[in-house]
């Protein structure tokens, strides 16, 4: 019989905020007696936008902007009911996107 597991994927533009949130989730899970694998850093998505500097002429003059999406993965193995309720009541910053998979 396979063990029950909760997979949490965190995404954010700010890596410091992301690491703090991952640390809080791991602390809550360990405090309630569940086994934790992670946080595992996933590849960073990098999006580059190319914009012309002038609105009229000179197409050769362009500017590049980039935005990076940092990601982490946390697996909680054999979670108890207390673990699930504590994770649901956990307050995390607004800049962190969370996806849960049971």
From Swiss-Prot:
One of its GO terms (molecular function) is tRNA binding. It comes from the Bacteria. One of its GO terms (biological process) is translation. Keywords: Ribonucleoprotein, Ribosomal protein. Gene3D superfamilies: Ribosomal protein S10 domain. SUPFAM superfamilies: Ribosomal protein S10. GO terms for cellular component: ribonucleoprotein complex; ribosome. InterPro entries: Ribosomal_uS10, Ribosomal_uS10_CS, Ribosomal_uS10_dom, Ribosomal_uS10_dom_sf. Involved in the binding of tRNA to the ribosomes. Part of the 30S ribosomal subunit. HAMAP family: Ribosomal_uS10. Belongs to the universal ribosomal protein uS10 family. This is Small ribosomal subunit protein uS10. The lineage of its organism: Bacteria, Pseudomonadati, Coprothermobacterota, Coprothermobacteria, Coprothermobacterales.
């Amino acid at each position: 019989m396979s063990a029950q597991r909760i997979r949490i994927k965190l995404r954010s533009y700010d890596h410091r905020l992301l690491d703090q949130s991952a640390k809080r989730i791991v602390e809550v899970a360990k405090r309630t007696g569940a086994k934790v694998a992670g946080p595992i850093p996933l590849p960073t998505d990098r999006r580059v936008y190319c914009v012309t500097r002038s609105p009229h002429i000179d197409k050769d003059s362009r500017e590049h902007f980039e935005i990076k999406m940092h990601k982490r993965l946390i697996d909680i193995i054999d979670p108890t009911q207390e673990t699930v309720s504590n994770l649901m009541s956990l307050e995390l910053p607004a800049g962190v996107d969370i996806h849960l998979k049971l």
